[in-house]
């Protein structure tokens, strides 16, 4: 398999719910079929929005912005309130204000707090004041964040403009939004190599990008990893089958993996383990494993890495990727990644391009991941306990907004 061709064939923005995302899904399905592996596409609903009008005024002067899709339509006007923290005292000052935050998005509890405090709208910031570009990413107000509360108008501005608003002491802000919201569709690509047992290991990686990114590192690299493992194990006799899931819409809140575990819930008891790949194969960066399962699996990964001479930093926890919905449904899960850092391989921006990828390192990563997968696929019995530890369950509750994280 020519790994470079995978990146060249998907070297464009392919964000959730777009025709470009579907184009990549169909490409991945075709790659599986070229390897002689049966593959199919499963669609699922995603909330979408077409922005028809978006205007932001600061003391009468227009400021460039990108309105969040799915945040509703209308107008909001009020005093600008810069809120760098999310503590109770800061939240209390949001009443009747247009809130400017230091971040690019908002979690469930902070959003709920702002609505209850009486905030009129929320402004977020994107980018770096020292970068030559003045990019502004298009994001969405997630249904999981809104919950049962009302929608607040939300918009993203560039970090340089955010600094100017605060530096100039802007008083009044007005945000005007018109958009058409509708139900769209995203897709998972599923492929399967059968085993001797009626049980399988699920391997996952998301293929969607954010709205400014070509998504080479995050996460066509993980998809290339799945295809590489598939190629190496397709003709081998395995005790456990291998189910490959290329997830759509991960960047909007793990929507693809959530849709998969919901659609296949009855089958999950036959899923012995989830192996998730999210960002591998860069020139630089530390290879890590985050285990959402018993601590013994983390130790096993460290021992195996030492045995074969492949450095891995392994720990238990909950990873912000498609392993999380599996762990939440009781399937032991591990996410692997090579963390290069924003100075070397930035993500969620225009700089996530294939030139940050090392095909040589990617092949080495795939070799280790294939060996790890094959060991578990040929286990007489998968040794990983199906019981998710209590500390991991607590972290899952916090990550999935069922419990407020202790401050």
Outline where the language-model segments fall.
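Noncatalytic luminal/extracellular "stalk/propeptide" segments of secretory-pathway proteins
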Residues: 1-98
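Second-shell loop/turn segments in exported
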Residues: 11-19, 100-104, 150-152, 177, ...
